[in-house]
């Protein structure tokens, strides 16, 4: 084992079980040795954190991103021992010589930095005396294949079992959370730095690369060699959360950090719009990421649509397949207006903001569009920052609130004509589609209704359920109805997925959704007939788990296409990209990947003809 001062990876044996809603983060069969590319904080303190089975060591300094060829680390097969293996390093180690402070800092800033670091050390010491909730415990949240990986430069001509369909020509990209630095306190899986994984297809061959999205936040933390920005979910709860906000504010006053150019992680969604690939999280503007000719990735920068966007944008904008417009929401947890709607024409021209009146800031992760309307959920998970004063989480399930859906004309200039329809006890983290049925004057919304509603954010005793549901909003009566699409006998947790995006906002028969079992892992995907409730399942295989299935259309027929999904073998500790025929659910090809792909979030596919016009 190299010394803690060297640039090494973390080798840790992970526990095989965990008594939490995230208990399945670790392998259920054996304890694989995992490669975690955390970077150690630049500090004179001992750079270790203690896990249940082994101590994790972190390198002192960050190695800058490079697009040059890297050495691929050798995947480590699972083992039941705690033997430590040192893989090949991805980049040349840096010298141990480091600047204690950035050279541009003056004496006052250096003194302030020293004092505030002492405050943080005391805060961390105080926090360590209290157990973290499992939804904020890094030993739970980023265990197993939820753990981060290092960047990987484009690797060409990957091994393929089977044959890649000729129609798959372009690049599949998927976003995910991948913390660069060791968490110093609480950490939720959603808090990690954004990393995009890309598989590029050319003439039946495939390449793979993964890169951090170089956010303003990440750039500043790299320059300091440590995490300094507060983590929205893992850290900001209770009195310690208030202390961390004050600590960040103090560092900002002395210009040690700067949050004025964005604090987001860009780890959730991806959309290709107006020749720009955008990486998004709802706490910031999008980031423009460019795909290189050899399939690698580079970050161009924070993207404000040529000066038109000056607020955050949620990670699930909706691209209208007919006219090419991009529809989006922006929400604010501090000040009114708490919610805004806007759209961009196909050539990138933004509409004026439409302020949507809400009494309190609400979790607004997703929404839906129809041919003529925007469907906005106003649900029971809300933000109450005052809860931190009494020691609680600011993300709250408000049992006294009635969930509702707002229907707004896509071209509305204000929210005066917006109609609200109550939908009691309904919380959908994601909405898969919506369409209009003029014969009954209804809007049909397809979503997965989740209970407990706040279980992703707050520790709950009740096990999570995610029920695929049809919600009907009657514009004539102002009433709603809701029914499960799948029968009770076949009920399974369905989360993450999509319909044919060429049919978005129009009536669709099929949805392709992740089988989120055993939660929070994904053991396969389901093709669901939204009319009959019939479920066809495709399982990734024994000890294999994946994430969001991406449906790639191939023709005019709705169900004609292929499913692409990253899959990780927890027994062999290797990852692959599976390509499945969406009509018969037969495996067409499996692309063997040169490095591990952690479980992540959402993705998209960009065809080669569109890539050639990339900005």
UniProtKB/Swiss-Prot annotation:
<dbReference type="GO" id="GO:0046872">
    <property type="term" value="F:metal ion binding"/>
</dbReference>
<feature type="coiled-coil region">
    <location>
        <begin position="571"/>
        <end position="592"/>
    </location>
</feature>
<keyword id="KW-0793">Thylakoid</keyword>
<keyword id="KW-0346">Stress response</keyword>
<keyword id="KW-0408">Iron</keyword>
<comment type="function">
    <text>Has a 11,12(11',12') 9-cis epoxycarotenoid cleavage activity. Catalyzes the first step of abscisic-acid biosynthesis from carotenoids, in response to water stress. Active on 9-cis-violaxanthin and 9'-cis-neoxanthin, but not on the all-trans isomers of violaxanthin and neoxanthin.</text>
</comment>
<feature type="binding site">
    <location>
        <position position="430"/>
    </location>
    <ligand>
        <name>Fe cation</name>
    </ligand>
</feature>
<keyword id="KW-0937">Abscisic acid biosynthesis</keyword>
<dbReference type="GO" id="GO:0016121">
    <property type="term" value="P:carotene catabolic process"/>
</dbReference>
<comment type="similarity">
    <text>Belongs to the carotenoid oxygenase family.</text>
</comment>
<keyword id="KW-0479">Metal-binding</keyword>
<keyword id="KW-0223">Dioxygenase</keyword>
<protein>
    <recommendedName>
        <fullName>9-cis-epoxycarotenoid dioxygenase NCED1, chloroplastic</fullName>
        <ecNumber>1.13.11.51</ecNumber>
    </recommendedName>
</protein>
<dbReference type="GO" id="GO:0009688">
    <property type="term" value="P:abscisic acid biosynthetic process"/>
</dbReference>
<keyword id="KW-0150">Chloroplast</keyword>
<keyword id="KW-0809">Transit peptide</keyword>
<dbReference type="GO" id="GO:0009570">
    <property type="term" value="C:chloroplast stroma"/>
</dbReference>
<keyword id="KW-0934">Plastid</keyword>
<dbReference type="GO" id="GO:0045549">
    <property type="term" value="F:9-cis-epoxycarotenoid dioxygenase activity"/>
</dbReference>
<feature type="binding site">
    <location>
        <position position="365"/>
    </location>
    <ligand>
        <name>Fe cation</name>
    </ligand>
</feature>
<feature type="binding site">
    <location>
        <position position="602"/>
    </location>
    <ligand>
        <name>Fe cation</name>
    </ligand>
</feature>
<feature type="binding site">
    <location>
        <position position="316"/>
    </location>
    <ligand>
        <name>Fe cation</name>
    </ligand>
</feature>
<keyword id="KW-0175">Coiled coil</keyword>
<dbReference type="Pfam" id="PF03055">
    <property type="entry name" value="RPE65"/>
</dbReference>
<feature type="region of interest" description="Disordered">
    <location>
        <begin position="20"/>
        <end position="45"/>
    </location>
</feature>
<keyword id="KW-0472">Membrane</keyword>
<feature type="region of interest" description="Disordered">
    <location>
        <begin position="62"/>
        <end position="101"/>
    </location>
</feature>
<keyword id="KW-0560">Oxidoreductase</keyword>
<dbReference type="InterPro" id="IPR004294">
    <property type="entry name" value="Carotenoid_Oase"/>
</dbReference>
<feature type="transit peptide" description="Chloroplast">
    <location>
        <begin position="1"/>
        <end position="41"/>
    </location>
</feature>
<dbReference type="GO" id="GO:0009535">
    <property type="term" value="C:chloroplast thylakoid membrane"/>
</dbReference>
<feature type="compositionally biased region" description="Low complexity">
    <location>
        <begin position="64"/>
        <end position="86"/>
    </location>
</feature>
<feature type="compositionally biased region" description="Low complexity">
    <location>
        <begin position="27"/>
        <end position="37"/>
    </location>
</feature>
């Amino acid at each position: 084992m190299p010394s803690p001062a060297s640039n090494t990876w973390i080798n840790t044996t992970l526990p095989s079980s965990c008594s939490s809603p995230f208990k399945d983060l670790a392998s259920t069969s054996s304890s694989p040795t995992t490669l975690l590319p955390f970077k150690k904080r630049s500090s004179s303190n001992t750079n270790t954190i203690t896990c249940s089975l082994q101590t994790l060591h972190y390198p002192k300094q960050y190695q800058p991103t490079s697009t040059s060829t890297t050495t691929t680390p050798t995947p480590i097969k699972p083992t039941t021992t705690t033997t430590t293996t040192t893989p090949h390093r991805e980049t040349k180690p840096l010298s141990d010589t480091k600047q204690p402070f950035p050279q541009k800092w003056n004496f006052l800033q250096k003194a302030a930095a020293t004092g505030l670091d002492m405050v943080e050390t005391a805060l961390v010491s105080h926090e360590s005396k209290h157990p973290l909730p499992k939804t904020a415990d890094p030993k739970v949240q980023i265990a197993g294949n939820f753990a981060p990986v290092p960047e990987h430069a484009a690797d060409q001509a990957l091994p393929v079992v089977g044959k890649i369909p000729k129609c798959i020509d372009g690049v599949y990209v998927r976003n995910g959370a991948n913390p660069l630095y060791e968490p110093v306190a609480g950490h939720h899986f959603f808090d990690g730095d954004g990393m995009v994984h890309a598989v590029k297809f050319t003439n039946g061959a495939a390449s793979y690369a993964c890169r951090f999205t170089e956010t303003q936040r990440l750039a500043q933390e790299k320059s300091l060699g440590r995490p300094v920005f507060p983590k929205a979910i893992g850290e900001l709860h209770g009195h310690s959360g208030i202390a961390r906000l004050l600590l960040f504010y103090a560092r900002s006053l002395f210009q040690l950090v700067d949050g004025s150019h964005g604090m987001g992680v860009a780890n959730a969604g991806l959309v290709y719009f107006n020749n720009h690939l955008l990486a998004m999280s709802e706490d910031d503007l999008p980031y423009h990421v460019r795909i290189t000719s050899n399939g690698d990735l580079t970050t161009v920068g924070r993207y404000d649509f040529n000066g038109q966007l000056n607020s955050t944008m949620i990670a699930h904008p909706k691209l209208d397949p007919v006219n090419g417009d991009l529809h989006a929401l922006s929400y604010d947890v501090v000040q009114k207006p708490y919610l805004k709607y806007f759209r961009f024409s196909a050539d990138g021209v933004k509409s004026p903001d439409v302020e949507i009146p809400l009494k309190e800031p609400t979790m607004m992760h997703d929404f839906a569009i129809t041919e003529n309307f925007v469907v906005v959920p106003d649900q029971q998970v809300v933000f109450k920052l005052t809860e931190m004063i009494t020691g609680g989480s600011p993300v709250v399930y408000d049992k006294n609130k009635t969930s509702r859906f707002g229907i707004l004309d896509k071209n509305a200039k204000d929210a005066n004509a917006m109609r609200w329809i109550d939908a009691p006890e309904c919380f959908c983290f994601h909405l898969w589609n919506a369409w209009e049925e003029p014969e009954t004057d209804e809007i049909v919304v397809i979503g997965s209704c989740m209970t407990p509603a706040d279980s992703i954010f707050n520790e709950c005793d009740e096990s999570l359920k995610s029920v695929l549901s049809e919600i009907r909003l009657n514009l004539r009566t102002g009433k709603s109805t809701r029914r499960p699409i799948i029968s009770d006998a076949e009920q399974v947790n369905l989360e993450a997925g999509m319909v044919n995006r060429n049919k978005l906002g129009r009536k669709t028969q099929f949805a392709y959704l992740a089988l989120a079992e055993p939660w929070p892992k994904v053991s396969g995907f389901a093709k669901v007939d939204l009319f009959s409730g019939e479920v066809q399942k495709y399982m990734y295989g024994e000890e294999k788990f994946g994430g969001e299935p991406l449906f790639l259309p191939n023709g005019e027929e709705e169900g004609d296409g292929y499913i692409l999904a990253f899959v990780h073998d927890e027994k062999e500790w290797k990852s692959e990209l599976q390509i499945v025929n969406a009509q018969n659910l037969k495996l067409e090809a499996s692309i063997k990947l040169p490095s591990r792909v952690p479980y992540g979030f959402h993705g998209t596919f960009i065809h080669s003809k569109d890539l050639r016009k990339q900005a």
